[in-house]
Amino acid sequence: MTAILERRESENLWGRFCNWITSTENRLYIGWFGVLMIPTLLTATSVFIIAFIAAPPVDIDGIREPVSGSLLYGNNIISGAIIPTSAAIGLHFYPIWEAASVDEWLYNGGPYELIVLHFLLGVACYMGREWELSFRLGMRPWIAVAYSAPVAAATAVFLIYPIGQGSFSDGMPLGISGTFNFMIVFQAEHNILMHPFHMLGVAGVFGGSLFSAMHGSLVTSSLIRETTENESANEGYRFGQEEETYNIVAAHGYFGRLIFQYASFNNSRSLHFFLAAWPVVGIWFTALGISTMAFNLNGFNFNQSVVDSQGRVINTWADIINRANLGMEVMHERNAHNFPLDLAAVEAPSING
C-alpha cells in the first residue's frame, strides 16, 4: 500500500512538472524544447561574456603565434572577439577535460568551440520552442519556419564551413572586426560575391528591407482617422479591436496608381506571406551557398574568359575582383603561408627568355 501511494505521489509530481513545462499560462512559455534551450543558451552567453572580457590570447593558426581577443588583453568592443579554436585542434571535440590543463584549453581556443556548440543547440531549440508554442495555441507553424533562416545561416558559418574546411579555426570569430576578417577571407578564398546564392541573399535582405519600409509607410499613411490634430495618431488604436485600423483599399489604390495596378496586393494575407517569405528564402539560399562553398564549390571566376572575335581579352569588373581576391589572400594569415594557394598552384614562369 505504501509503495502504491509513493508511486502515485511521484506520478502526480511528474504530472505537475509536465503541466507546468507545457502550460501556456506561464508568463514565459518553457516547453520541452525550452528545457534544453535554457541551459545551453545560458552556458553560451556566460562563457561568451567571461571570455570576451578575460580570455588569454589563442594560437588560432597553430603556429605558436597567439592572437589576442579579450578586453583585458588590449582590445576594445570593436576589435575584441572570441578567437576560434586552434588549427592544431582541427575538428576534434575539445571539452575542458580533453586538455592537460585549463591554461592549455584556453591557449588552444577551447571557449570558442564550447560557445558555438551550445549556441547552435540553443537556437535550434528556440526554433523548436516556437513551433511547440504555436502548436499548443492552435496556430500555424510558419513562425518557426521563418526563424529557420537565421538558424541555417548561423549553422553554416559556425559548423558547416569549419567541417568543410577541416578545422574550427576557419569558423567565424565571435566579434565585430573578427566577422569582417571572416568576410574578407571568405571572399578571397571562395569569391562569394560572384556566387548566385549570395546574390539571392542580398536580394532577400535588401528587398525585405524595402518591402518592410514600403508596407509600414503605406499603412501609416492610410490610417483611419480616430483622433484630433492635438492627439497622437497611435491613440486611435485599441489593442484587440475588431475593426481595421487602416484602409487597405486606399493603400491599394495609391500603390496601384504609383506603379501599376497589379504591383499592389489586394489581399492582406498574401501580402504578409510575401513579406515573410522574401527575406527568408533569400537567407536560406545564402546559407546554402556558404554550405556549398565550405566544400570549395566556389563563386563564378571568369578569369579573363570574356574575349572578342580575335581572342583578345576584354577586361571586365570580374577581373578586378579576381585581382582583389589575390591581394586579400596574400595578406591573410601572413605567417602561416609562404604563398596564397592560387599563386602556389601556378607553374613558375620561365626566366630563360
From Swiss-Prot:
Its Enzyme Commission number?
A: 1.10.3.9
Asked if the Swiss-Prot or TrEMBL record annotates the protein with the keyword Transmembrane helix, the reply is yes
Residue numbers for the site described as Cleavage?
A344, A345
| PTM text | Tyr-161 forms a radical intermediate that is referred to as redox-active TyrZ, YZ or Y-Z.
Location(s), subcellular: Plastid, Chloroplast thylakoid membrane
Topology relative to the membrane: Multi-pass membrane protein
**Where on this chain does a quinone bind?**
H215, S264, F265
Chain positions with Phosphothreonine modification? T2
Query: What detail does the entry give on cofactor binding?
Result: The D1/D2 heterodimer binds P680, chlorophylls that are the primary electron donor of PSII, and subsequent electron acceptors. It shares a non-heme iron and each subunit binds pheophytin, quinone, additional chlorophylls, carotenoids and lipids. D1 provides most of the ligands for the Mn4-Ca-O5 cluster of the oxygen-evolving complex (OEC). There is also a Cl(-1) ion associated with D1 and D2, which is required for oxygen evolution. The PSII complex binds additional chlorophylls, carotenoids and specific lipids.
- What's the short name of a Pfam family annotated to this entry? Photo_RC
Stored SUPFAM superfamilies: Bacterial photosystem II reaction centre, L and M subunits (SSF81483)
Quote the cellular component terms of the Gene Ontology held in the record.
chloroplast thylakoid membrane; photosystem II
Its family remark reads: Belongs to the reaction center PufL/M/PsbA/D family.
- Recorded protein name is Photosystem II protein D1
